[in-house]
Swiss-Prot record:
EC number per UniProt: 3.1.11.6
Stretches of the chain forming a coiled coil according to its record: none
GO (cellular component) term, any one: exodeoxyribonuclease VII complex
Subunit and partners: Heterooligomer composed of large and small subunits.
Any Pfam family matching the protein: Exonuc_VII_L
GO molecular function: exodeoxyribonuclease VII activity; nucleic acid binding
Compartments, record wording: Cytoplasm
GO biological process: DNA catabolic process
Keywords associated with the record: Cytoplasm, Exonuclease, Hydrolase, Nuclease
Location, primary (coarse class): cytoplasm
Organism encoding this protein: Leptospira interrogans serogroup Icterohaemorrhagiae serovar Lai (strain 56601)
Reaction catalyzed: Exonucleolytic cleavage in either 5'- to 3'- or 3'- to 5'-direction to yield nucleoside 5'-phosphates
Name used for this protein in its record: Exodeoxyribonuclease 7 large subunit
Function: Bidirectionally degrades single-stranded DNA into large acid-insoluble oligonucleotides, which are then degraded further into small acid-soluble oligonucleotides.
């Protein structure tokens, strides 16, 4: 035997506890099994064991966790799955599963489907905060979409009437659980959105129920109806859970129908107080405006225009006459200047015509002179032109040869001649 110091029971237990608390595999785990040894203490804590064919584990479901449980009552023999963390009870030296959530078998798949739908709708922007409609401060007409026979509608009407007796209430009855519930809820919301009813705010929901009872408010059609509503919607489903999709799509959600009515409907005394304050502000604003306008009128009445209006009018009239005379003179000067310019243009035109006439006469004279000196005119006076066979003009006898044939150009035509002699 080794000479080591023996451990106390407490020390061993503490070591085991540290090992358990330090293990990630024993934290936030799901465990499934059959309930046995079920009991509920006066403190509200629930104790039971989960067992299968080979083992058993003690479980504690404390009251601060089990008060949110809305499923079917727990009892021995029921198959469930629980979520929690393994802890060690030092005094007894036994380990225990500290339960924070309980689901009936099969609920896990449903929750997974709800989570997938939640993610899909979130991507579409169905839950975006900026799309939320503002709940009116002073609604005239309240619309209610819920079961006509449940406690929820009684609570909503009772609270609404007690807070503001004059509120108009319009009820669109619908089925709130079961296979037909989603279509019924959607129809009720669409009816309350009809413009004829002039509904200012809608409370839609029901009292508490089990996980299965509340499934209609996780239906995609219902969630979209909430999001597409023209009228602001307050979701009011009792025993709120963290997977109720209609709560996320609503413009506001409350944990109970009673809380929804209290949120939607103001107290009559608060409305009267608001109106009184508003009246006071309006009166104060009017008094300030009247006083300001009175001072302005007093200031304006001391000005010259109000003291001697006719004198000012005469001055303005005289000024208009002066401007008219100046305009008349300016127009007359413009016309005279234009007239002088026109006369200048007319004289210039006459001078240009005379110059053109003289230029034409000179051109005709010189044209006549040029024509008189042309070969044709000279030949008309009895002269002729002599050319050799190459067309060269003969100017002297030396340029020809005896017996050479020549061409004579006369005024009336041409003829051929032959040179004779030397």
């Amino acid at each position: 035997m080794e000479d080591s110091k023996p451990l106390s029971v407490s020390e061993v237990t503490r070591i085991i506890k540290n090992l358990i608390s330090g293990s990630k595999d024993l934290k936030n785990i799901w465990v499934r099994g059959e309930i046995s040894n079920y009991s509920k203490a006066s403190s509200g804590h629930i104790y039971f064991s989960l067992k299968d064919a080979g083992s058993l584990i003690r479980c504690t479901f404390f009251n601060y966790s089990n008060k949110n449980y809305s499923g079917k009552p727990l009892s021995d023999g029921k198959e469930i799955q629980v979520y929690g963390t393994i802890t060690l009870y030092e005094a007894g030296g036994s380990y225990n599963l500290n339960v924070t959530r309980v689901e009936e078998l099969g609920q896990g798949d449903i929750l997974l489907q709800i989570e997938k739908l939640k993610q899909k709708l979130a991507v579409e922007g169905i839950f975006d905060p900026e799309k939320k409609r503002r709940i009116p401060s002073f609604p005239k007409t309240l619309g209610i979409a819920t079961s006509p026979t449940g406690a929820a509608i009684e609570d909503i009407i009772k609270i609404s009437r007690s807070r503001f007796p004059g509120i108009n209430i319009l009820i669109a009855p619908c089925i709130v659980q079961g296979e037909d519930a989603p279509d019924s809820i959607v129809a009720a919301i669409e009816e309350l959105n009809h413009p004829n009813w002039k509904v200012d705010v809608i409370i839609a929901g029901r009292g508490g129920g089990s996980f299965e009872d509340l499934m209609a408010f996780n239906d995609e059609k219902v969630v979209r109806a909430y999001a597409n509503s023209r009228v602001p919607i307050i979701s009011a489903v009792g025993h709120q859970t963290d997977v109720l999709l209609s709560d996320f799509a609503a413009d506001h959600f409350t944990p109970t129908p009673t809380a929804a009515a209290e949120y939607a409907i103001p107290k009559e005394e608060d409305v009267l107080q608001f109106l009184s304050q508003l009246e006071g502000r309006i009166k104060s604003s009017l008094v300030t405006k009247i006083s300001s306008n009175r001072d302005r009128l007093r200031l304006l009445s001391g000005k010259f225009i109000f003291k001697e209006p006719m004198q000012l009018l005469n001055q303005r009239s005289q000024r208009v006459d002066e401007i008219g005379i100046r305009l008349q003179k300016a127009l007359s000067n413009k016309l005279n200047l234009a007239r002088v310019r026109l006369e200048r243009y007319q004289n210039l035109t006459s001078r240009i015509q005379n110059i053109l006439f003289h230029k034409k006469q000179k051109a005709e004279f010189w044209t006549s002179k040029v024509e008189d000196l042309s070969p044709a005119a000279t030949m008309k006076r009895g002269y002729s032109i002599l050319r050799n066979e190459n067309g060269k003009i003969i100017r002297s006898p030396e340029e020809t040869k005896p017996e050479e044939e020549l061409q004579v150009l006369l005024s009336g035509g041409t003829m051929q001649v032959i040179r004779k002699g030397k």
